[in-house]
Amino acid sequence: MFRATRCLRLPLRNSHINILRPTQTELIKTRSSALAPYEKVSPITAVGATPVGVGNGNYCYSTKTRQKHPLINTRNDLKKAQRVVVKLGSAVITREDECGLALGRLASIVEQVSELQQSGRQMLIVSSGAVAFGRQKLRQELVMSMSMRQTLRGPSGMTADKRACAASGMPGLMSLYEQLFQQYGITVAQVLLTKPDIDDDQRRKNLQATIESLLSLNIIPIVNANDAVAPDPKLNMHISDNDSLAARLSAEIEAELLIILSNVNGVYTGPPDLEGSRLLYTYVPSENSGVTFGANSKFGTGGMESKVTACVNALNNGVTTVITNGLAQDAITDAVAGKKIGTMFCNTKGYEGPPIEEVAEKCRDAGRQLAALSNKERGAMVRHLAALLVDKEKYIIEANQTDLANAKSAGLDPQLLNRLKMTPEKIQDLHAGLNTIADSAETLVGRVLKKVKISEGLFLEQVTVPIGSLMVIFESRPDCLPQVASLAMASGNALLLKGGKEAEESNKALHALVQEALGTHGFEMRDAVTLVRSREDVADLLQLKDLIDLIIPRGSSDLVRSMQEKSKGIPVLGHAEGVCHVYIDKDCDEQKAIQIVRDSKCDYPSACNAAETILIHKDLATAPFFDSLCSMFKAEGVKLHAGPKLAALLKFAPPPAESMSFEYGSLECTLEVVDNVEEAVAHIIRYGSGHTESIITENTNTAEHFLKHVDSACAFHNASTRFADGYRFGLGAEVGISTGRIHARGPVGVEGLLTTKWLLRGEGHLVEDFKNGKYSYLHENLNPSEVYRALDAAGELKKATA
C-alpha cells in the first residue's frame, strides 16, 4: 500500500475529455529493446507521481511539482527529454487529395510514440486531421443526397463547411487513434480546446491539471483545437493554428521537447524549392533573422512562418523545438535520439557551430586558393608539415597516449590498438614519406599530357588539374591523416577528413600541424584541410554533391559499403570487399607455391589484399603437395573451409564454407578444387570482388591466359597478393584501392587525385572558317615540350627554349 497526501481522480464525464482505454493495459510498460537508442527514464520519478492503493489492485496518483529542467541546447542532450510533445501537421497525416488520412504514415507515427512512451517518457500529441477525416464522411453524405442528374454531373464544386467536417471527423479520428495505440497496450485520451481554455486563467489551470493527471496515469493525451466551434483565426498567438497550440501547451506543461512534424525537412533560408535555399540544421533566433518564407501548405492553416514563430515562443518559455519532415522514416525517434535531422531551435549558448554546408563551402573555397599556388609553393607546404611532425613528436605521442588509454579501457581489439598507436618510428616514416610527396608535387598539377595542332595557329592541350573537393573517411589509424593531407596539399585539392572516434585526440593534434603548415609562407589556407568531428556531419556531407567531388573511405568493407549506399550522386573511390584468390596450377614450383600462399594469407590477414580463397588444380589435390599445404596452414594457425568440390573429393574434409565469396579478414580461408585454369578464371569472375588475383605456375602460356582473362584490378604471376599496395607499386603514399572501372583502378596514389581539362588556344578561329575552306583540320599530335611547357598551376605558359 502506498500513501500520499492527495489523490487526484480524473473527471471522466468532462465534456472536453474522453478517456480511451484498451481492455488490457499495463499501467507502466517498459520494453528493453525500445530503451537502446534513448536514455532510460524512470516513469514514476520522471512524472513526479506516487501510486496510492484504492482497492482491488487499482491505483490513482498524487501529483507533485516537477523540478525545473534546464533548457536543452545541444542535440546530444535531446535524449534526456522526459516530457515530449509531438505536433502532427495536416500535411503529414492527411492524404494528398485532402480527403481522409494516410493510414500507413499514421501507424508509423503511433509506433514511434508508443516506443518512446514505453521507454519511460511522457508523450503528448497535438493532432490535426479531424477536418480531413470528416470531409471524407461528409462527401459521401453529399453524394448520397444528390439527385441522379447531379450525380451524373460529377462531384465538382461539392464543398462542406470546415466546422461541420471537424465535428463529423473527431469521433472517427479518436477511434482510429484508440485502435492503433491499443496494439501497444497504451491508453489515450482526447482533449479538445477552444480559445477561452487558453486565455482564461482558471480554465488554463484546469487544463494543466487534467493533462498532468493523464500523464501521471501513463495515458497519452491527444490534443486538438475544437474546430467545430472555433472562431476565425486571430493575429495574436493563441490557438489560431495547431503550431501555436502545441507551443503554448508545451510551455504550460513544462515539456522539455516539442517536435513539429511537417512535410518539409525543416527551416530553409528561403522557400525550399528556390534555388540556393539551404536547410538550417540549427536556428538561433538572434542570428537567423534573414529567413524568407514561402506560401502556406494547402492542407493546414499554419505555414512555415507560423511554425517558426511558434518555435521561438516555445524556446522563450524554456521548450526546445525541432521541426522535421514527418514523411521520413523514424523521424520522431531519430529526433529524440539526437540525430541531425530537421531544424533545432536553441539559444546562442550551446550553439553547435556553423552548418556543415558552410564548413564544406569554406573548405572548397580555400582549396581553390591552394590550387592557384605554384607546384613549388605547395611542395614547400608539404615539406614544412614533414618537419613539424618531427619537431612536435612529443606533442603527438602525448595526445596518442590519451587515445590509447581510452581505447584500452573500452576494450578495443589488440589489433586495432596496434593500428592506433603512434611511435617515433612511425613518425620518422611519415617524415620520409611526406618529403617524397613534396618532391613529386613539383610536377603534378599543370602537366601537359597531350598536345594537338588542330590547325594553323590553333593548339589543343590536355593538362592535369585537381579533382576539387575530397572527403576521406578513415578508421583507427591516425598516421593516415598527415599522409592524406599531404597528398591533397600536393595535388591542390580541398580535403574534408573524418577519423575514427578512438583516435580523436591524435587526429586533433595532427590536424593542428596540418593547419599550421597551410598558414605558412604568407598564405592563409587553413580551411583547405578541415577535420569533421561528428558522424551526423558525415551523413550530411554525403548529400552535398555540389560541394564534394569524390569520397574516399579507408577502412573496413562495412565502411566502404556504407559510403557507397549513402552517397547521393558523389563518386566513391574504394572497394567494398577484398575477396582475393591464389590459383595453384599443376605446373607450379611447389616450394614457391607454399611460400607465396603463406605470405598472401598470413603476412597481414586483415588487409584487403590478403588471400581469402586458394584454388588448387585437381591433380594437386590428391598429391603429397596438398598435405604439405595443409601442414603449413596448420603451423600458421589458419582455419580452413572446404568448397563443395573439395568436400566431395575428401573423406574427411574441413568444415564447408558458408559462402564462396567471403572476406574473412582473419586467419581463415577457403580451399577449393578446379579442373584447369579456365575453371579457375570462371570461379574468380563469379565469386571474386575484382581486387587482386594471383596464379602460381611455371607454364608461361597458362600464366598469360590467367592474366588476360581475370577481370580484376590486379592480376599477378608467381607473386603474393600482398603486393597490391601503392607504396609497393612505387606510387608513394596510397590514397586507397579501387575496384571501380572509371577514373582510377587498383592501388591509387597521388595521380588518382588529379583529373584533366582541355585548353584550346587560337587566334580568332571560327568553325565557319573550316566550312568555307579558310582553314583545314590537321589534328597533328605534338610532343608538348616542342611548343609549350606548363610551368605552374596558375596556367602561365612560356615558349620552350631551343
Curated annotation (Swiss-Prot):
Key words of the record: Amino-acid biosynthesis, ATP-binding, Kinase, Multifunctional enzyme, NADP, Nucleotide-binding, Oxidoreductase, Proline biosynthesis, Transferase
Annotated stretches, region: Gamma-glutamyl phosphate reductase: 355-802
InterPro entries tied to this protein: AceGlu_kinase-like_sf, Ald_DH/histidinol_DH, Ald_DH_C, Ald_DH_N, Aldehyde_DH_dom, Asp/Glu/Uridylate_kinase, G-glutamylP_reductase_CS, G5K_ProBA
GO CC terms: mitochondrion
Reactions catalysed: L-glutamate + ATP = L-glutamyl 5-phosphate + ADP; L-glutamate 5-semialdehyde + phosphate + NADP(+) = L-glutamyl 5-phosphate + NADPH + H(+)
Pathway given in the UniProt record: Amino-acid biosynthesis; L-proline biosynthesis; L-glutamate 5-semialdehyde from L-glutamate: step 1/2; Amino-acid biosynthesis; L-proline biosynthesis; L-glutamate 5-semialdehyde from L-glutamate: step 2/2
One Gene Ontology MF term: ATP binding
EC code(s) of this entry: 2.7.2.11, 1.2.1.41
Record-listed substrate binding positions: 128, 227, 242
A Pfam family the protein falls into: AA_kinase
Membrane-spanning intervals of the chain: none
Signal peptide start and end residues: none
Region entry Glutamate 5-kinase, spans: 1-354
Keyword NADP: yes
GO biological process terms held by the UniProt record: L-proline biosynthetic process
Entries under PROSITE patterns matching the protein: GLUTAMATE_5_KINASE, PROA
Annotated ATP binding sites: 262-263, 301-307
Stated family: In the N-terminal section; belongs to the glutamate 5-kinase family. In the C-terminal section; belongs to the gamma-glutamyl phosphate reductase family.
HAMAP family per record: ProA, ProB
Matches recorded under NCBIfam families: P5CS, PRK00197.1, proA, proB
Protein name: Probable delta-1-pyrroline-5-carboxylate synthase
Source organism per UniProt: Caenorhabditis elegans
Gene: alh-13
